[in-house]
Swiss-Prot record:
It holds the Pfam family Guanylate_kin. GO terms for molecular function: ATP binding; guanylate kinase activity. Its EC number is 2.7.4.8. Signal peptide: none annotated. It comes from Bdellovibrio bacteriovorus (strain ATCC 15356 / DSM 50701 / NCIMB 9529 / HD100). This is Guanylate kinase. SMART domains: GuKc (SM00072). It is found in: Cytoplasm. Keywords: ATP-binding, Cytoplasm, Kinase, Nucleotide-binding, Transferase. GO terms for cellular component: cytosol.
Length: 185
């Protein structure tokens, strides 16, 4: 039986969004679940494509309304996944795939034990730092928070069903694609 939910997690800057965005373009059996966030939009992002961007007050109201399957405060912003986005994917007969933070993975696994999880490792902590520093608008304090969180997240990787090191993107993506294809068979 094919998997109904694939969860991809990684430290910020390890490549999880790139993997998920590409595989959903290439495989029509998948729907990328777009999460909600209170963080600022980055250059090149389109609202509703990478994230649904909302302010803190709206996010907190949605929490009270029970709108989210899971939500978490990551770094200094909120992120959450709506029930309706999953229901829409499943009603279309598709597998939901999403990139979320480590906190969200535990919540999803408690509610959906059959969900499959993939952890994307950076090639090294130094390379991860370089990738994060290269992003627009990162202040040193934010970089340090992300690096501290990354070390904690990497320690959780053994709890995942699959692990990939994103050292050479095409090779790593090929490994990821094979895992997803096997889960959809």
């Amino acid at each position: 039986m094919k998997t109904r939910m694939i969860i991809v997690a990684a430290p910020s800057g390890a490549g999880k969004s790139s993997f998920v965005e590409r595989i959903t373009r290439e495989d029509s059996r998948l729907v990328d679940i777009v999460t909600f966030t209170t963080r600022s939009i980055r250059q090149g992002e389109t609202p509703g494509l990478q994230y649904n961007f909302i302010d803190h007050a709206d996010f907190e109201q949605k929490i009270k309304e029970g709108f989210f399957v899971e939500w978490a405060k990551v770094h200094t912003n909120f992120y959450g996944t709506s029930y309706s986005s999953l229901e829409t994917a499943w009603n279309q007969g598709k597998t939901a795939i999403m990139d979320i933070d480590i906190q969200g993975v535990a919540t999803f696994k408690s509610k959906f034990p059959d969900a499959k999880t993939v952890f994307i490792h950076p090639p090294s902590i130094d390379e991860l730092r370089r990738r994060i520093e290269k992003r627009d608008g990162k202040v040193p304090a934010d970089i340090e928070v992300r690096m501290a969180n990354a070390e904690k997240e990497i320690r959780e990787a053994s709890k995942f069903d699959y692990q990939i090191v994103n050292d050479v993107f095409e090779k790593s993506y090929g490994e990821f694609k094979k895992i997803v294809e096997d889960l959809l068979a």
